[in-house]
Amino acid sequence: MSETNERNRRHVYQGRVVSDKMDKTITVVVDTYKNHPVYNKRFRYSKKYYAQDENNEAKVGDTVRIMETRPLSRKKRFRLVKIVKKSV
């Protein structure tokens, strides 16, 4: 399998930065929606991810895109790809 196909299969999520207090690390909340299997009510499900921010450029409130990568630390498995929208 070629290198480009491997890289394209990685998960890419878009979420909101809720913490930037760590050096070169941001905490991103990703909101997704699920349907309840019995009642078919749609509800919001959120999950926090740690992401590598090499230049410390993302701030709290920014909307960012993160991509799955090799394990960078015990909890960090994502890296910052792009800041989609800056906070006010």
From Swiss-Prot:
One of its GO terms (cellular component) is cytosolic small ribosomal subunit. One of its GO terms (molecular function) is structural constituent of ribosome. The keyword Electron transport does not apply. The keyword Oxidoreductase does not apply. InterPro entries: NA-bd_OB-fold, Ribosomal_uS17, Ribosomal_uS17_bact/chlr, Ribosomal_uS17_CS. It comes from the Bacteria. Keywords: Ribonucleoprotein, Ribosomal protein, RNA-binding, rRNA-binding. One of its GO terms (biological process) is translation. Disulfide bonds: none annotated. Pfam families: Ribosomal_S17. PANTHER family: 40S RIBOSOMAL PROTEIN S11 FAMILY MEMBER, SMALL RIBOSOMAL SUBUNIT PROTEIN US17M. One of the primary rRNA binding proteins, it binds specifically to the 5'-end of 16S ribosomal RNA. Part of the 30S ribosomal subunit. Belongs to the universal ribosomal protein uS17 family. This is Small ribosomal subunit protein uS17. It comes from Lactobacillus acidophilus (strain ATCC 700396 / NCK56 / N2 / NCFM). The gene is rpsQ.
